[in-house]
Amino acid sequence: VTRNCTTYNIVGRIPGKHPDRMVLLSAHYDSYFDGFQDDNTAVALMFGIAKALRDSGFQPNNTIVICAMASEEWGVVDSNFDWSTGAYEQIFTAHPEWVGKVIADLNFELPALAHGTRARIRSCYEYVSFLEEYLADLPNLTMAYPEETAVTSPIETWSDDFSMAIAGVPSMVNDFTGGSFMETHYHSQFDNDEFYDEQVYRLHHELFALLILALDETAVVPLQFSPVVQRIRKGLEQCREICYRADVAGQLGEKKRVLLEKIEELETLSDRALRRCREEYEAVEEYN
């Protein structure tokens, strides 16, 4: 181990009409051993999507930022929390101003590997509704799996989208944690092209390129906060059960009641705001 080294995140852009509103594509370029799946195929996927967008003549509304992250696998010595360092530093140190400007981080991990019986987009709660609508309207894509693509949530701590999300950037990743590869080849010298699946790789190119186009057409960032509120409410119910067992429920009852009222108020306001924005946008579209 060589201490006190410097690594670099590598950033490129496809300028959009609105430079202060961005969609981020991210993947890490460091790896254990050769890292064919984890994560060189993901970096190549970003470049492939970017090239396709440029070659098509597409002029985005949002600036598309492509970021190859360093130090995802390992970036801190003498720590149990040594991964996703490059992404953490990118959003907390190098570009904290991205929070509020990046409307979505599309992170990529092991995208040329078949995971289970279907592709999944693992997303933060706020994007689940939009992604489900997006998947419902998709044209026929490469048939890489026997089952249709699905959305799952929440995101997990395994990958760089988590570092982005805890900073306030709504994030998602192609779900990559299923399958025997994770038990036999992951983070080892056996991560080579043996498990390369061209159909899965094509599907992920198509799926996320079209998602970029769908996000680019939104006048309002399509975040839905109801799932977050519902998860908080569920957590409070679980907390109540623990409190009853610990015989402290009475002490926390009033605080919980006030918190639940605020949560319900937040849910109502967020739903109303999103609905109003969509109605106004549709009215403008109809007028034009």
Locate the predicted segments by residue.
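Phosphate/adenylate-binding glycine loop and adjacent helical scaffold
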Residues: 286-288
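Short, glycine-/Ser/Thr-/acidic-enriched flexible segments
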Residues: 15-19, 29-31, 71-73, 110-113, ...
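Active-site-adjacent substrate-binding region
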Residues: 1, 5, 102-103, 110-230, ...
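Soluble metallo-hydrolase cores and metallopeptidase-like ectodomains found primarily
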Residues: 1-37, 47-58
